[in-house]
């Protein structure tokens, strides 16, 4: 299949004004200008998209859809196991329900990839999974599993375990438990090749890919001091760090150059003490200071289908529109460790696209994609 005569977004301020995308077996095989078009590309079928522009399918970098299901209370709440503060062996893939209405809402908004995982009740909460938003069996929707391990600092673990009168009740306790488990996993890993192997430990096993930097360390943090704690722990154990929320990041942006950050939800009330200094300028200031910034909804905290409106708020507060596009494409894939598969339109990546009319503003409340493509198949038409 080939899409031709279409405007193609490649990168910040970089487009092919009249181009083609040739793909087969769900993978992009060739991208180029129409002057380089080969007639044999049409043998598997074609769509003439004159008058349209095409983006990589959008990537929502941090959410919990399918783990807190739409319209349900306890019955659909599967994101926090609040009986043990250290649960790295708990896997989002075993809890996320792809039949949740949020998946189809995301798809209609052009979001083709979501990174889903547990909440922030536990200092080590479990593994995240990157999946496509179209499908019935989650195992067939996987892009990468696990994609990272979730850690949480600050108010949420403190509140959870203070109510149970058990450790951790302080920021000291949270950091100490995280370090203790990471050190256990490190020593466990070192002994696996010994003649006298250690007994199987599910928690340590789950952390081995993290210690080998094969998956990301997603650190939930809002306050500036918690951001610094996340960086400190990541350096101690050589983790591939991504800060999640980083609400006060704009206050310490000079320290965050080169750091991977998922900012959001940008549209939210000041719901608790540690977010009382939240600012809509956060993505702009972090980007200006050379952090790699993505924007998330944290759905269901904010409805996932309005990811584009979150970007619009960031643009209103200083972020360049072209950089805002990166926050839900290239940067989102990079900060989640899946840029080799999604996040841009180039050879050997998955054929996931969001297609709009050429004159439409993709961040407008009045606009949604005309077509959404997953694995090279049109799965939504407006």
Language model regions located:
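C-terminal cap of metal-dependent C-N hydrolases
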Residues: 6-10, 14-19, 346-382
């Amino acid at each position: 299949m080939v899409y031709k005569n279409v405007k193609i977004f490649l990168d910040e301020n970089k487009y092919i004004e009249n181009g083609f995308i040739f793909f087969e077996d769900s993978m992009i095989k060739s991208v180029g200008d129409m002057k380089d078009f080969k007639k044999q590309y049409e043998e598997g079928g074609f769509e003439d998209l004159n008058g349209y522009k095409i983006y990589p399918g959008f990537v929502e970098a941090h959410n919990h859809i399918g783990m807190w299901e739409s319209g349900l209370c306890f019955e659909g709440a599967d994101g926090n196991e609040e009986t043990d503060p250290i649960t790295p062996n708990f896997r989002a893939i075993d809890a996320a329900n792809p039949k949740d209405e949020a998946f189809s809402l995301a798809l209609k908004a052009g979001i083709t990839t979501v990174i889903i995982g547990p909440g922030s009740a536990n200092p080590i909460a479990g593994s995240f999974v990157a999946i496509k938003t179209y499908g019935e069996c989650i195992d067939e929707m996987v892009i990468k599993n696990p994609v990272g391990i979730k850690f949480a600092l600050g108010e949420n673990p403190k509140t959870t375990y203070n109510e149970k009168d058990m450790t951790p009740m302080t920021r000291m306790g949270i950091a100490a438990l995280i370090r203790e488990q990471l050190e256990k996993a490190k020593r466990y890993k070192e002994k696996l090749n010994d003649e006298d192997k250690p007994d199987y430990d599910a928690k340590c096993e789950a952390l081995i890919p993290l210690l080998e930097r094969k998956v990301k360390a997603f650190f939930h943090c809002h306050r500036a001091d918690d951001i610094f704690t996340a960086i400190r722990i990541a350096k101690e154990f050589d983790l591939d760090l991504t800060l999640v929320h980083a609400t006060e990041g704009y206050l310490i942006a000079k320290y965050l150059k080169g750091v991977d950050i998922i900012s959001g939800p940008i549209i939210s009330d000041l719901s608790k003490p540690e977010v009382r200094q939240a600012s809509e300028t956060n993505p702009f200031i972090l980007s200006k200071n050379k952090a790699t910034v993505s924007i998330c909804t944290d759905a269901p905290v904010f409805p996932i289908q309005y990811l584009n409106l979150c970007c619009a708020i960031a643009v209103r507060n200083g972020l360049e529109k072209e950089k805002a596009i990166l926050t839900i494409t290239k940067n989102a894939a990079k900060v989640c460790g899946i840029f080799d598969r999604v996040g841009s339109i180039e050879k050997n990546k998955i054929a996931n696209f969001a297609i709009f009319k050429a004159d439409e503003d993709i961040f407008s409340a009045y606009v949604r994609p005309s077509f959404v493509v997953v694995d090279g198949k049109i799965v939504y038409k407006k």
